[in-house]
Amino acid sequence: MSVTSIALRVETWLSATWHVKVPVTWLEACINWIQEENDHVNLSQAQMNKQVFEQWLLTDLRDLEHRLLPSGILETPKGELNGFFALQINSLVDVSQPAYAQIQKLRGKNTTNDLITAETQVTPKPWEAKPSRMLMLQLTDGIVQIQGMEYQSIPALHSDLPPGTKILIYGNISFRLGVLLLKPENVKMLGGEVDALLEEYAQEKVLARLIGEPDPIVSVIPNNSNQIIPRITDVLDPALGPSDEELLASLDENDELAANNNTSLERSCFIGNSSNTVPIRQSDFETELVISPRPREKPRNQSMLFTDEELDDFSLEEALLLEEAVQKEQMETKELQLLTLNRTTDESIEKFSHRSNTLNNFSFICKNGNNNWSEKNLSEQMTSEDKSLSCPSTRDQNSSSLSVNHNVPLPHDFTNKGKSSETYKIKQISSSDGHSLNNKMFNGELVSNVPKRSSDVPNENEHHLQTCSLQLSENSTGLPITMDLYSPPFIYLSVLMASKPKEVTTVKVKAFIVTLTGNLSSSGGIWSVRAKISDGTAYLDVDFVDEILTSLIGFSVSEMKRLKKDPCKYQKFLEGLQKCQRELIDLCCLMTISFNPSLSKAMVLALQDVNTDHLENLKRRLKK
């Protein structure tokens, strides 16, 4: 007898006896498998019927993808369901009892209140109704996920039913907002279980999710600072990421760890208003200076001290950091136009015109005299709104640098006359190591040498101003927005955002994953997951293409569905998921992204490790 004729008879028997409907393709495959297992011994029709039914009881209906429930049942507010429907129970919970009490009972922890109170709990009166059990079932026909509520007590059901149990619901069943109201006359137990669901829908795990308790799979979020922040997820279920302040702090800390150890950490003081800064005593200066920590800037001429031969000894990461520092200095060259000067005296902020002048390795020397701000070579008119003047504070006792070296044209020599007799002067200084200032004559007046460390200053009130640098406040990334989007080996996210492309643009960036913003899911036969990436200059929401996720997991969606039928092989898929999770967490590489400006998000098309070719491209870009 052919497999097709046997399948037709089995299909008729399943429908007539159990009201079970299955796809013909699955039925024929099941019959072939049963015959192979029995060495092609001719089985009677009754034996074949029984074995097929047993296999159906152990099958996950989601793999069959055979619709039974009417379409639109979830969208209909209320109605009645008529007929016979063989459904699968994924999980069930007794909603009449607190979930916390149930999970404590499962764990064998006795936390009843009468053990720690003076009085026992109030005994219910005889006439008071006892609380009745109410099970809430998560049901599926393989396509539609629907809930079933134990509207009246159903003896056939209990909370210890294994996930994947099959039941038959029949008769007239009312439903409200996607919930079937089940009664004893509507439910018949068929049995069965699904091994693949035993772990995912274990009773303890289901209750733990209800009370918001995390699943016991721990992962970490990289913050690029050698610190580990534990994050607890369910496979690839994302948790709340760190705050913006923590992310920015972590990026700053990473720069400090990866940069040269010879470069000291500076603290800067800004002339301007800030709600988060502390003013210096006004007796020291007529202008109010406020202290605010900021990320250390790498001196320009320090980065230029390295020759091409020395760059060969650098690691790739150090070379990338060096490139970023150079880009920051180029940004100051192109974008520096404004300077903010806020004074606490009654004088209003004056506007100054300037002549352009290139000052190499400049520093700000402050000396008590008349309150004149004298400078030569003035160019460009400066307002006091968007730029801030910053100088390292004398309060930083451990700072080993008294001048911030810049090899950029600086348009600021300015004069501000006030009531006191202090003179502020900017002069050009040549220093081989950037840590000392020589005695020089400037405008006929001797300017005293500034000690290397603030602890060497005999009178703090007379030497509060040290070397100062100019900080651009408009663009916190410090990167040139005019940078070519296709400059090899990569560009910066901030440059991409600032260029405001009108159409979909494909570029390369060197970035890492800050956090996953969505679950790993499969739809239409492809994997998908959403994440937020950063390169230290900006953040961007991205999706990953199926090819990347398939390579990380090791299995495609279709392969995963086949593996789910075999518990032994399915374990390999779970291991692949964990491997994918670890690699996404540690991911920091070159990403080819397709940026869609209308959606303000991108698609990651390819991943590539940094290699020596990229280092050579960086060298060439440095020489331009």
Curated annotation (Swiss-Prot):
Instruction: Tell me the GO BP annotations in alphabetical order.
Output: DNA replication; double-strand break repair via homologous recombination; glucose homeostasis; multicellular organism growth; reduction of food intake in response to dietary excess; resolution of DNA recombination intermediates; resolution of meiotic recombination intermediates; response to glucose
Q: Which family does the similarity line name?
A: Belongs to the RMI1 family.
- What is the primary gene name for this protein? RMI1
- One Pfam entry for this protein is RMI1_N_C
The entry describes its oligomerization and partners as: Component of the RMI complex, containing at least TOP3A, RMI1 and RMI2. The RMI complex interacts with BLM. Directly interacts with RMI2 and TOP3A. May bind DHJ. Interacts (via N-terminal region) with BLM; the interaction is direct.
What cellular component terms from Gene Ontology apply here?
nuclear body; RecQ family helicase-topoisomerase III complex
Function per UniProt: Essential component of the RMI complex, a complex that plays an important role in the processing of homologous recombination intermediates to limit DNA crossover formation in cells. Promotes TOP3A binding to double Holliday junctions (DHJ) and hence stimulates TOP3A-mediated dissolution. Required for BLM phosphorylation during mitosis. Within the BLM complex, required for BLM and TOP3A stability.
Q: Does the keyword Cytoplasm apply?
A: no
- Modification sites for Phosphoserine: S225, S292
Q: What is this protein called?
A: RecQ-mediated genome instability protein 1
Q: State the organism named in the record.
A: Bos taurus (Bovine)
